[in-house]
Amino acid sequence: MKNRIKNDVKEQFLNSLQTIISYPSVLNEGENGTPFGQAIQDVLEKTLELARELGFQTYIDPEGYYGYAEIGQGEELLAVLCHLDVVPAGDLKDWQTPPFEATIVGDYLVGRGVQDDKGPSLAALYAVKSLLDDGIQFTKRIRFIYGTDEETLWRCMNRYNQIEEQADLGFAPDSSFPLTYAEKGLLQVKLHGPGWDDLPLQAGQALNVVPDKATYAGHRLEELLPVLDQSGVQYSQTEDSVTVLGVSKHSKDAAEGVNAIVGLAESLSLIQPHPALLFIADAVGEDATGEALFGKITDEPSGDLSFNLATLVIDQEQSEIGIDIRIPVLADKEALVARLREIAASYQLEYEEFDYLAPLYVPLDSPLVSSLMAVYQEETGDKTPAMSSGGATFARTMENCVAFGALFPGAEQTEHQANERAKI
């Protein structure tokens, strides 16, 4: 693969990346009058400042929902769709280094956002700058669009699309090389049910993360422990609580994770048969493809459905289950919803659609896909075919956009996990 990036530019890139990683840009809605939190506002402003230093023209939405950096000339607009918000760091004890300090450990940079998506976003910016410095002439304007709400509801891009110029083509550097031409539909659901005076329980952090911890601190702890032992789940124990341990993964790869909420619910439901626990244990179970609920749902372009039971809250007043479902591009979403409503109702749970993103599909023979694949293969010699994904990137927010990079085939995927890292 040709190397067009000079060493001094690489050093500048790493310094800039360490700077923007240092902002803990996790959603904190409404903080200090910002839409999504002060740290998100600050990292947006800092990233645009860095872009201006590289020669880009910048703009920030007056309300702080998004910003962009643009360079070049031409009538056509190519968008590079990025985001600067990140998922929570989770339990700091699981990190070898502070998550918001971007520490170099051997050949890796470790920190929240180095893979998803601060690292790829900044790498693409410096790549364009390096090409321009080498005298490469572009016939299109290139606009880096920086979203701030990708990990939750995409309100940043909703606002952008209401106001701003639409791109003619583009890509999101928020997946893997060579290219993702199909992304499953993303349905996020909350199921509301009755509370319980004697069952305080809260587990899971984000809907798009397989929960790796679920803690019970109720008075029936002594009854629960032998049930957990018999189930075979991994857990840790303190004097007054027990925490079931799982393996965190992105929801799109839920089948590769171990869901701690499911592990706890299957045992706890045997001694406290609360409707939410019974739904999880009996109707869902450990299968992360949703087959127990829906039957086998799959298609040729995008593969199996992915089902992540991501959050659970039970208190005196109510219970709430949060679910993330990645729906194959040819599947019938409404039929799935009808089935989920029916089963949930039988457990006294009321369905609420929290968020939905329609699937992405750009044909393999389209000019965009053909061009990007040709460039990738010429530069790398790698003949890995274009692929589909259960992930949801900003590529689906605009017409004629795909996910392009930034992980190479075989690279370790650590986004949304402790010790998120990228090779440097």
Name what the model sees in each region:
Residues E151, M157-P328:
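Midchain, well-structured core segments that form catalytic/ion-binding scaffolds
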